[in-house]
Structures are given as structure tokens and as C-alpha cells.
Amino acid sequence: MKISPTKFLLSRRNAMAISMIEPRSAWYDIINEQGKKTKTLSQNIGEIVGYGPHFFIVRRSVWYDLYDESGKKYKTLSENIGIVTSVTGETFVVRRSAWLDTYDRFGKKINTRSAR
């Protein structure tokens, strides 16, 4: 299921930014910028590899799933894109061989540069 960026932005009007994702037993607690737990997700969704203020990335088997701040999955990418190395603000960086690819939070590649 694809969500257009416009619909995505409209749907998160009342959403608060992610402050922290806290692992607890077999769960992940999503904590907003006011310090309140907004959602609890099972760790069965996979391993959280990083998060920004409005999204987080989960590695599940050979897939990367993108979730919004309310805990809804909105995009799945193959691990063939590379290894997620960092998540900052509204973007994330993936290392693919000798290249670093930058993606926006919607999973669209926006830049490629040499990893040196």
C-alpha cells in the first residue's frame, strides 16, 4: 500500500514528534516529545535500526519497514538497497558497496555519493 506524501502529511497533523523509542521486555514503547507513551508495538515487528522525529526504520528479515510516529507501517524496502547507517531528521543514509545513498522519510532516494 502506497501513501502519497500529501495524504501522509495531512494524516499526521495532530501527531507529535518521536522523542525516543524504548525497548521493554518484548515491546517497543514510542515516546513523544512531551515524554508520553503514544504507542506500544511488539518486538515481533523486527529490529529498530534508527528513528527520526517523524518516522522510524525496522529491519525485518530481508526487508526494511518504514513506520510513522503513530506506529503505522507505510513503506517496505528490500535490504538490497544496502545497510542503514544513520537516521537524521527527515532522511536516512544507506551504505551500498562504495556508495552512500540518502533517502527521504518516504523511502525515495534523493542523493548518491561516494563513501570514499
Where would I find each of the regions flagged by the language model?
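Short beta-strand elements that form the blades of beta-propeller/WD-repeat-like
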Residues: F8-L10, N14-P23, G52-R59, T85-R96, ...
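Residue-identity detector for glycine
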Residues: R12, G35, G46, G50-G52, ...
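Residue-level detector of conserved, function-critical positions
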Residues: L41-Y51, F55-I57, T76-V87, V93, ...
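Surface-exposed loop/turn elements that mediate protein-protein interactions on large endomembrane-trafficking
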Residues: I3, S25-Q43, Y64-E79, T102-S114
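Charged, amphipathic alpha-helical segments
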Residues: K2-A17, L41, I45, V49
